[in-house]
Amino acid sequence: MLEHASDIRGILVVSAKEGAQLGTVSEVHIDPQTKHVVAFSYRTRRIGGDRYYVPVEDVDRVGRDVLLIASEEAVVHQTNGEHAPGRSLEDLQGMRVTTMDGKHLGELADIDISYADWSIGALVLSGARRLPVEVADIRVGDGVLVPADSAGRLVEPAEKSG
C-alpha cells in the first residue's frame, strides 16, 4: 500500500524501549539516487527544540499518529549545520516533472511511498494527478525526469460526488 510522504509530517516520534515521545516529524528525506526514503527529521517538543533525525532502517512502524523507533539510541542529533541524509520532501515539492522527450507534466506536489521497502511508488503532481512509477525509471536532479510514455499513465483524481 502506498501512502503520501507528506502525511508523515506532524506525527509523533516515539521510542519503544524508553516509552518516550521524542518530538514530531518535521521532514521526510529521500535519496535522489535510490529513490527511497532514507530518514525522518524531527524537532523536540520544546519551543525552539533541537533537531534530530532517525535513519529509516531504525523505524519499526509508522502508524496514523506515531512513527515508532526501537530506541533513542537510533537518533542522530543535528548539530552545527549537520543535515539528515538525502533531500527533504519540501525541497523536492514544486519541482517540474518532465518526460524524457520534453513534455512538462506538472509540478511535484507529493510522493507516494511504500512502507514495506520505503521506495517511491508514485509521484503526486499538481492537480492531485498521480503517476505510478518504477524507481529505476525516474531521475531526480533539478527537476524530475520520467519515461516518455508517462503522460499516458497519469491517473486523474476521482470526481467527488456532491
What are these regions (language model features)?
Residues M1-G162:
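Peripheral interaction segments used for macromolecular assembly
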